[in-house]
């Protein structure tokens, strides 16, 4: 579909992509250009984010503000499957287009699809943009008179869901057919659309026909489209598709240890420890920090650095231990730590593991031979790491980007983030980071602070000042103390330059049982705003900010996590921040967040409230060797001052990820 998502040309269908599918799309339709990303988050839900370039209008009439850039607009679509197609009944879906912005293409629709051989037939009713033909009576108008007229414009400062507009006003019929040719890569589409183009943001457009036709050609993961619309306009487009469940990377890796022909040590004294430790690193990705071995039990304290899948990591390590340790040892303990704070004990039944790993039982199930538990107090006391202090230095690239700016649609900054630190003991360390800008086009900024009247303190809208102060910028410099409070409780205290725009002191406590679907934490912080003129100094603005946060992985929505944080934000507004994340089989995580506070849409300004999206991608999808770690790419349509949280450099939910993994 031209605007993104599964559809014909201008009209959606009730069809869905396979779960986990992601498509990146570009279409050119004369007066409009569309850039969009569509995702199939669940089998029954499709979502699309879109930028529209209105080529017949300027971004603004002020040349010093936006020059000759054409008007850009953001839009969000969502579609839900209500009924899955059967032999006799069609697929039925309900959808909302451009429901969370300025409403350029705001529409609601319900449609049905039925396949018959190589043909796929579609029919639907549309309201809003899809209903401007007004060729049938709005069925809801018969129920309540308020549905007969659709309100104009949008509420607040844009960015809000105008639910009061839903299914109101003119209604039109739309539909079409898709024909899959005998050539698998080629399909034809024809549709009757419901819009009359008399109310478009590009101006009143000529429509010689309601019929649109065209072809789709697929080459590998690309779709190329060519169409003829409105009886007078040629359009074209290209889409790239992948599946976030099935995407993989070929790995060059050592095979897991073969234990069928293994010759374990006769007793503890004869263990070849050098070979054991080397194998744990090279084949198991497990770096040892301390070991306690007796006649019945072996405990290995360390950290997994290569394999993000917990079962793969455990079974690789288990095979090595079963190959090297004497059979008199009945239990292996793989105790993992984060920053020398114990997090998790994976207990392996040695005899059962050997039997299942060598297929000596009728129905082997290796995962049933081990369990994950919290480290005991005895293990905490016995843990004597070979190194508790020392320095480190690391560097990585950073990429900052911004879409839809008045100066230029796409602004970017590329650089190197250099991080250094020193650990004094298990609990305490100091850390800092410096940004070095290598390449950017932020010099295109026509203004550093917008001219809107600031009702709230400018806690984020001065961001342009902070990112343009020079080639080298001190990003953070802070000290942190982290420790285990009790079996399922952790705490930390920190202070310093905590993020680019704020410094201060704070603390956090987190309750997180092993493999629990629930976690709960509280953080409290006192911060001052850093000076963008001298990053070592502060402005006068200060605030207390903190949240009570609940994390929940609901059983009825597999591979998802919901985070709800209630408290006070940086601008001293109060409310909640809600974050919803979905994980796919490849490890890719897609999420969305929004803040709802006691600040009105008018006080907040453009966008009405803080919201954003992100995608988190594991590094091992890009490299040939197994690797942990990931990169995150956020997209915040409008960032103003309300509903903004402190970006704390150390967060216990990340530190304790081992205890109930969601990201890894």
Regions picked out by a protein language model, each given a short descriptive name:
Residues 1-104, 116-117, 129, 161, ...:
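Transmembrane beta-barrel domains of Gram-negative outer membranes and organellar outer membranes
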Residues 29, 49-77, 81, 87, ...:
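Outer-membrane beta-barrel translocator/channel fold
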Residues 22-26, 37, 49, 78, ...:
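Membrane-embedded beta-strand positions of outer-membrane beta-barrel proteins
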Residues 41-43, 79-86, 116-118, 181-183, ...:
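Outer-membrane beta-barrel proteins
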Residues 24, 35-39, 76-80, 110-114, ...:
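Residues on the lipid-exposed face of transmembrane beta-strands in outer-membrane beta-barrel proteins
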Residues 22-24, 296-304:
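Short, aliphatic-rich beta-strand segments
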Residues 144-146, 151-161, 165, 169-171, ...:
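Flexible, glycine-rich linker and terminal segments associated
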Residues 18-22, 33, 43-45, 88-92, ...:
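Outer-envelope beta-barrel architecture signal
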């Amino acid at each position: 579909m031209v605007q993104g998502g599964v559809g014909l040309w201008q009209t959606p269908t009730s069809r869905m992509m396979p779960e986990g599918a992601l498509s990146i799309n570009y279409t050119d339709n004369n007066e409009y250009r569309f850039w969009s990303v569509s995702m199939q988050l669940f089998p029954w839900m499709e979502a699309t984010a879109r930028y529209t370039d209105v080529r017949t209008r300027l971004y603004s009439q002020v040349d010093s503000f936006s020059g000759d850039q054409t008007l850009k607009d953001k839009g969000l679509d969502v579609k839900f499957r209500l009924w899955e197609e059967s032999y006799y009944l069609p697929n039925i879906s309900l959808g909302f287009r451009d429901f969370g912005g300025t409403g350029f293409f705001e529409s609601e629709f319900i449609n049905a699809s039925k396949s018959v051989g190589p043909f796929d037939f579609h029919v639907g009713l549309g309201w809003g943009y899809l209903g401007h033909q007004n060729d049938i009576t709005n069925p809801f108008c018969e129920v309540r008179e308020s549905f007969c007229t659709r309100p104009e414009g949008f509420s607040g400062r844009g960015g809000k869901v105008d639910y009061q507009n839903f299914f109101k006003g003119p209604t039109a019929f739309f539909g079409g057919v898709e024909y899959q040719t005998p050539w698998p890569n080629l399909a034809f589409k024809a549709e009757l659309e419901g819009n009359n183009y008399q109310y478009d943001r590009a101006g009143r457009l000529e429509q010689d026909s309601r019929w649109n036709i065209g072809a789709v050609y697929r080459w590998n993961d690309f779709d190329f489209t060519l169409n003829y619309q409105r009886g007078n306009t040629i359009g074209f487009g290209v889409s790239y598709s992948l599946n976030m469940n099935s995407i993989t990377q070929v790995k060059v890796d050592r095979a897991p240890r073969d234990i069928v022909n293994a010759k374990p040590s006769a007793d503890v004294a004869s263990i070849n420890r050098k070979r054991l430790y080397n194998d744990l690193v090279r084949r198991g990705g497990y770096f040892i920090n301390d070991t306690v071995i007796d006649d019945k039990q072996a405990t290995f304290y360390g950290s997994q650095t290569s394999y993000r899948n917990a079962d793969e990591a455990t079974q690789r390590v288990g095979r090595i231990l079963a190959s090297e340790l004497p059979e008199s040892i009945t239990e292996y303990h793989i105790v993992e730590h984060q920053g020398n704070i114990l997090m998790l004990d994976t207990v392996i039944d040695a005899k059962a593991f050997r039997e299942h790993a060598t297929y000596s039982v009728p129905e082997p199930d290796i995962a049933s031979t081990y369990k994950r538990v919290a480290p005991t107090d005895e293990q905490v006391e016995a843990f004597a790491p070979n190194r508790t202090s020392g320095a480190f230095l690391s560097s990585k690239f950073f990429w900052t980007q911004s879409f839809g700016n008045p100066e230029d649609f796409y602004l970017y900054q590329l650089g190197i983030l250099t991080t250094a630190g020193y650990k004094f003991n298990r609990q305490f360390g100091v850390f800092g980071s410096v940004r070095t800008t290598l390449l950017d086009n932020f010099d295109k900024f026509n203004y550093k602070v917008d001219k809107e009247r600031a009702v709230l303190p400018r806690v984020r809208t001065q961001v342009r000042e902070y990112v343009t102060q020079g080639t080298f910028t001190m990003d953070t410099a802070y000290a942190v103390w982290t420790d285990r409070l009790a079996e399922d409780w952790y705490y930390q205290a920190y202070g310093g330059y905590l993020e680019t725009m704020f410094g201060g002191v704070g603390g956090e406590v987190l309750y997180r049982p092993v493999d629990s679907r629930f976690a709960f934490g509280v953080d409290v912080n006192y911060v001052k705003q850093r000076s963008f003129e001298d990053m070592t100094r502060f402005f006068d603005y200060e605030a207390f900010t903190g949240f009570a946060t609940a994390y929940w992985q609901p059983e009825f929505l597999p591979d998802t996590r919901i985070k709800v944080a209630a408290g006070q934000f940086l601008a001293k507004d109060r409310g909640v921040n809600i974050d919803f994340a979905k994980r796919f089989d490849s490890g890719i995580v897609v999420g969305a967040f929004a803040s709802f506070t006691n600040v009105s849409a008018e006080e907040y300004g453009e966008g009405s409230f803080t919201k954003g999206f992100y995608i988190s991608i594991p590094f091992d999808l890009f490299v040939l060797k197994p690797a942990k770690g990931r990169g995150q790419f956020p997209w915040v349509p409008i960032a103003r001052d309300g509903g903004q949280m402190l970006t704390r450099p150390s967060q216990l939910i990340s530190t304790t990820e081992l205890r109930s993994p969601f990201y890894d």
